[in-house]
A protein has these predicted regions:
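Short secondary-structure transition/capping segments
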Residues: 50, 74-81
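Short glycine-rich anion-binding loops that position phosphate/pyrophosphate groups of nucleotides
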Residues: 2-5, 79-83
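Surface-exposed, charge/polar-rich loops and edge strands
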Residues: 57-74, 83-87, 96-149
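Short amphipathic alpha-helical surface micro-motifs
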Residues: 16-19, 34-36, 94-98, 117-121
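N-terminal active-site beta-alpha-beta segment that forms phosphate/nucleotide-binding
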Residues: 1-69
Length: 149
C-alpha cells in the first residue's frame, strides 16, 4: 500500500487479482518485510500495521520466495530513483534487506522493478554500498533498464 508520496498501485493490484494472478503484499516484521497473499483489496484482508500502513492481516497465507513460481514481477515503492535503477527509500532499510533475500531466489524471467512518478526520477541519487539496485524503474513516461545486472 502506498505510503506518503509513493505511487499508488491499487488499480494495478485490482487487475492482477482480476486476471487470477497471485498478489502478495509486504508486512513489516521486526526489521524485515514478509509477504502475505491477499485475495482481495477490501478491508477484510487488511489491518493497520507498523507505521500506520495498511498491511495484510496476519491470518493470511505467508508467501515464501523459495516456492515454485515463474515470471514473478516485484514492484517496489521509493522516495526517489535514478536512471541507473538505484532506489532511495524511507531510510529504514526494509526494502534493501528484502531485495538481498529476493535476489538470492530470483529466477530467469523474474523482474525487480521500482515504480515512481516521473518527478521522482533523477539523473543520479546518492547511494551507500548496501543500497540495492533494481532491474528496472518504471514511471508513467518511461522505463529505465539496469545495464549492470
Amino acid at each position: 500500500m502506498a505510503l506518503g508520496s509513493e505511487l499508488d498501485l491499487t488499480e494495478l493490484n485490482e487487475k492482477v487479482l482480476a486476471d487470477g494472478k497471485k498478489l502478495v503484499l509486504p508486512v513489516v516484521f521486526g526489521k524485515d518485510l514478509i509477504f502475505r497473499e491477499v485475495k482481495g483489496l477490501t478491508e477484510e484482508y487488511f489491518a493497520i500495521g507498523s507505521f500506520g500502513i495498511r498491511e495484510p492481516k496476519e491470518d493470511l497465507p505467508l508467501w515464501d520466495p523459495k516456492e515454485e513460481r515463474s515470471n514473478t514481477l516485484w514492484l517496489l515503492p521509493g522516495v526517489a530513483f535514478d536512471r541507473g535503477c538505484r532506489r532511495l527509500g524511507q531510510g529504514g532499510g526494509y526494502y534493501d534487506r528484502t531485495l538481498e533475500r529476493l535476489r538470492a531466489f530470483q529466477r530467469a524471467g523474474d523482474t525487480i522493478a521500482g515504480v515512481a512518478f516521473s518527478c521522482q526520477i533523477a539523473d543520479r541519487i546518492p547511494t551507500e554500498e548496501w543500497d540495492a539496485s533494481l532491474d528496472k524503474v518504471i514511471s508513467p513516461g518511461e522505463i529505465y533498464i539496469n545495464q549492470h545486472i
